[in-house]
Each structure stands twice: as C-alpha cells, then as structure tokens.
Amino acid sequence: MSFSRRPKITKSDIVDQISLNIRNNNLKLEKKYIRLVIDAFFEELKGNLCLNNVIEFRSFGTFEVRKRKGRLNARNPQTGEYVKVLDHHVAYFRPGKDLKERVWGIKG
C-alpha cells in the first residue's frame, strides 16, 4: 500500500458507497436518509466526546479526549515566533485489533 498519492474520500462518497451496499443487499434507503444517519452519528460522537465519554467500537477502535500538556517554547510555523501553548484537550483515536490487522497487515 503506497501513501504517496492517497485518494480523498468525502461524506458524499461514503453515502454513495453505503447506498450501493444497501442496494446490493436488495434493500432500499434513499441517500438523504443515509446522510441523516451519518450526520446524527457524528453529532452523537462529538457530543459524547464533549462530555468526556470514551466511545468504543469493538474491533474498530476507541475515541476519547486526552489532555495535552502545554509548552513554553512552541514555535508558530507561519511566523517562526516562539509562543506559549497552554494545556489543552484533544480528540484521540486508538485503533482496535481488527483495524490494525486490516490496515497494517499485522496479525495479533
């Protein structure tokens, strides 16, 4: 697998792929409803992360919020000036075993 020129997949592409998958299983669901489900999923994900909840999808991975320590000598990449970065929270994703095996070709 080469990472030099990776294709960019958008939400619309995912909606199209899910729609095709559903049709291949002899089901019918309009794309607008698929988009609503995807939007609702991401709103729930964001809302739970804002509440500092850990979100686990077995075999896929875990989303959580972690605290990142601040630094005194961070550098602004655009200006080169030194700035102080305070402690802050970041969203973090930890891939699950099945995802690691599938993406990285690792057998656990």
From Swiss-Prot:
> What InterPro entries does the entry give?
Hist_DNA-bd, Histone-like_DNA-bd_CS, IHF-like_DNA-bd_dom_sf
A single GO CC term for this protein reads: cytosol
Q: Which SUPFAM superfamilies match?
A: IHF-like DNA-binding proteins
One of its GO biological process terms is: chromosome condensation
Name the CDD domains on file: IHF_B
Key words of the record: DNA condensation, DNA-binding
One GO MF term attached to the UniProt entry: structural constituent of chromatin
Which Pfam families does the UniProt entry name for this protein?
A: Bac_DNA_binding
Q: Which PANTHER family match?
A: DNA-BINDING PROTEIN HU, DNA-BINDING PROTEIN HU-BETA
- Family in the record: Belongs to the bacterial histone-like protein family.
Q: What does this protein do?
A: Histone-like DNA-binding protein which is capable of wrapping DNA to stabilize it, and thus to prevent its denaturation under extreme environmental conditions.
The protein, known as: DNA-binding protein HBbu
